[in-house]
Amino acid sequence: MTAWDGVLPFYPQPRHAASFSVPLLIVILVFLSLAASFLFILPGIRGHSRWFWLVRVLLSLFIGAEIVAVHFSGDWFVGRVWTNTSYKAFSPSRVQVHVGLHVGLAGVNITLRGTPRQQLNETIDYNERFTWRLNEDYTKEYVHALEKGLPDPVLYLAEKFTPSSPCGLYHQYHLAGHYAAATLWVAFCFWIIANALLSMPAPLYGGLALLTTGAFTLFGVFAFASISSVPLCHFRLGSAVLTPYYGASFWLTLATGILSLLLGGAVVILHYTRPSALRSFLDLSVKDCSNQAKGNSPLTLNNPQHEQLKSPDLNITTLL
């Protein structure tokens, strides 16, 4: 046993695959902290409104967390395959590996894991990310991967998404991810506005803001789905073909958009048909919401001059 437990500290260490996205983990922890804080104060809410608040807050946090989290997820378009393929360039050695392709809004993530992991006297476990954000150079990252001598399956898939590739995947995925991310951030802004309006005596406008949230969320899904119009290149890895498909983030965002539309539509419909039930669910007082529910409010003005002359009060009522 050496001083460093058998590790040579002055030489490059074995690669370790990243197990989770740090920004995604931060988003999940933030919204889980908000949910936990609300659950701590939930026993202080009296009566049946406690359960109304529970459903309302948890649904709202779920929608907000999902809209933010999918920006950092790489599961919008995924593909997995087990294959026997070459491992390094200029080498006849072949390995049995599991290859994963994960396309997100900001880039592509390629995983390579040996089955078993120990093959050719080394551990085969790679997780490489290539980004196409506005301030990132995908080609430069790909050239850097070539210089590092990454395995052939990783370089093969990464090359398919380069700007110079005849597949044309880079431009389509780059634009689709850019517009999808932009519309989802707009949806998140309307989600904040909807929560603010639903906490005030303005449930109608809160419902409209929630409808807008769902609309922009679906716009983001449709923007990313536009990639299906591009003929997909065949990803042939050794003896197998990798066939990508829409991943969990895509379907979860689609479900969130539909949920936002349903909730927003329910708020608008209840505002006109069952305003008392809507007030009970939102825990708003009758006095605060009566003016908006009726559509007009009486304004009564007393004339002080008639009181001085001891004449009957003159009430002026104006309907606004």
From Swiss-Prot:
Gene Ontology molecular function: enzyme binding
Membrane-crossing segments per the record: 22-42, 52-72, 184-204, 207-227, 250-270
Post-translational modification summary for this protein: N-glycosylated.
Localization of this protein: Endoplasmic reticulum membrane
Any matching Pfam family: DuoxA
Gene Ontology CC annotation, any one: endoplasmic reticulum membrane
Keywords noted in UniProt: Disulfide bond, Endoplasmic reticulum, Glycoprotein, Membrane, Protein transport, Transmembrane, Transmembrane helix, Transport
Principal localisation: endoplasmic reticulum
Membrane topology annotation: Multi-pass membrane protein
Name the record gives this protein: Dual oxidase maturation factor 2
Purpose of the protein: Required for the maturation and the transport from the endoplasmic reticulum to the plasma membrane of functional DUOX2. May play a role in thyroid hormone synthesis.
Cytoplasmic side: 43-51, 205-206, 271-320
Assembly and interaction partners: Heterodimer with DUXA2; disulfide-linked. Interacts with CSNK1G2.
Organism ancestry: Eukaryota, Metazoa, Chordata, Craniata, Vertebrata
Glycosylation site residues: 84, 109, 121
Family named by the database record: Belongs to the DUOXA family.
InterPro entries for this protein: Dual_oxidase_maturation_fac
Extracellular-side segments: 73-183, 228-249
Encoding gene per record: Duoxa2
Example of a GO biological process term: protein maturation
